[in-house]
Amino acid sequence: MVGKMKKVIIPLLISLFIFLIPNYALNPEIIVTPEKCLVNNSVYVIFQWRAPYNVEDFNVTVLSDAVVFKNSTLYYAGVAEDAKVFHIFEGEAVTPGNHTINVQMSYIIDGTLIKKKFLLNISILTLPENIYVSYNNTYNRDEENTSLLENITKIFENTTNVTTPNSTNAIINETNITQNKTNISKNIDIGNITKANTTSQEKITQKFNNTSTQTIENVQKDKGNNWLMYGILGLIIGIVFGFVVMYIIKI
């Protein structure tokens, strides 16, 4: 019974020992950096492995449908025992989304081909489109220009309302002057000039001169105000025209 147990245990231990040695040799350190990146950014796969014994035809291949590597294969005809293999695979991210990088490792030991595969995860992101930002800026600029035009229209209407009564008053005053002149001419009798009439005429003339002077001053003030309003209106129209030209140039 004991002999039979030895016959079973010894081959099992030998098989386990043989199995563990290749497994130890097939566990390299593999790192992908960065794990998250933008499209067209660089991606690096760092491979590091120490051979516990002599191997032949050592080969490492890196594959991915989302990353294009400049050189995806590492090959050595032989690796000595306890030798360290270190290599960096450089690539470029081309496809957005969550993807995997496939690392395949193979070598020959004592005429036996050993293969191993490792999967690494990577997330590739895309930048937001700028068209939405441009659309919002255009919308806000149109609102500002509309508000500016409305304010300028209100100012123009108020200026027109202020200017019109002054011009009308000037015309009415000029009409009154003409009527006063006519009435004075009719009331003066050349044949009956007396001292009292002379005094009355002097008073009438004085009132006429005062009225004429005051009316002329009012007309001059109104004209001055009109020129000031025209200047302000021209300045406002010039500013509006400048905004319109700048808006057209930016578009």
Swiss-Prot record:
The chain crosses the membrane at residues 8-28, 229-249. It is a multi-pass membrane protein. It comes from the Archaea. Keywords: Cell membrane, Membrane, Transmembrane, Transmembrane helix. GO terms for cellular component: plasma membrane. This is Uncharacterized protein MJ0545. It is found in: Cell membrane.
